[in-house]
Amino acid sequence: MAGSHISIPTILKVGKNTLENLGSYLKSSGFKNAVLYFGNGLISMFGNEIMDSLKKDGITVLDYMELDTTKIEDIINLAFNIDSKAQVIVGIGGGKVIDTAKYAAYLRKLPYVSIPTSASSDGFSSASASLLVNGRRTSVPAKMAYGIVADTEILKSAPEKFIFSGIGDMVSKITALYDWNFEAERGYSEMNDFAVMIAKKAVNSFVRTPFETIHDDLFLRELVDSLAMSGIANEIAGGSTPTSGSEHLISHSLDKMLEHPQLHGIQVGVATYLMSRVQNHRYIRVNAIFEKTRFWDYVAVSYTHLTL
């Protein structure tokens, strides 16, 4: 039965300079031995700060490395070579390394802590991973994050396209929830009321957040919090239906059609507006948040260069 066992993060720290307190967060949860996976090029950027924080609080780093693969066979090999003394896996970076960390943790039945360096999608909080299986991008079961530590100073320093991608992915919950309800009313699906509530609260809280620019601390905190709640909604529902609907199917099609696809959340955001018009559902709200955040301005420039 979906939802009979639900995992949710124990640690959720979002704000300024949270990275320097990583050691204390792990120590408070009883962890002593950690394995760290960094995204490509990130050890030079964040390695010293993380190592110093862990050392200060008595956390032993058994192993650390940079990773740039999502091949399932590579991750299986990686997982079963993890030191037997490891108590927690920490993934620092974007989608690739977070997916690697959560799948390795899933295979070894270890908790993992997600440290996203951009807020481009809800992947850092979801219990699934997008991996290459026999050369094809495939969604596989993975570990729900034990902890999420997001430093807003790091998030705001990432290229703006990643923030716009997160905005698109977050707003897509509006059309995804409509689709889920549409299916349920016709007997093709069964809704989980609590998952619906969490997903609705996430997107509504986000679109109502007051802000001056998308680099505001409050805006970034709300974006990360809402994306994290989306991942929890999926966990409760036992699948991605609260957060992924027709707009995601359009994005998947674009991935196959375009020579150089846009970031996932950018494509999903554009498809969200299109589907909200088809659904005749909250398209004014969708357009308003995209205008205020300048999402449309970014799309207008970036889509000029697309080729089929």
PLM feature spans:
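ATP/NTP phosphate-donor binding region
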Residues: 1-88
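Solvent-exposed alpha-helices and their adjacent loops that cap or buttress functional pockets
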Residues: 4-5, 81-84, 105, 138-143, ...
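Fold-independent oxyanion-binding glycine-rich loops
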Residues: 16-17, 39-40, 92-94, 115-118, ...
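Structural motif
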Residues: 33-35, 87-90, 111-113, 146-148, ...
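A short, small-residue-rich loop immediately preceding and capping a beta-strand
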Residues: 82-104, 108-119
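A glycine/threonine-rich phosphate-anchoring loop and its flanking beta-alpha core
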Residues: 107-202
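Active-site segments that bind and position negatively charged phosphate/pyrophosphate groups
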Residues: 194-296
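Conserved small/polar residues in nucleotide/adenosyl-binding loops
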Residues: 304-308
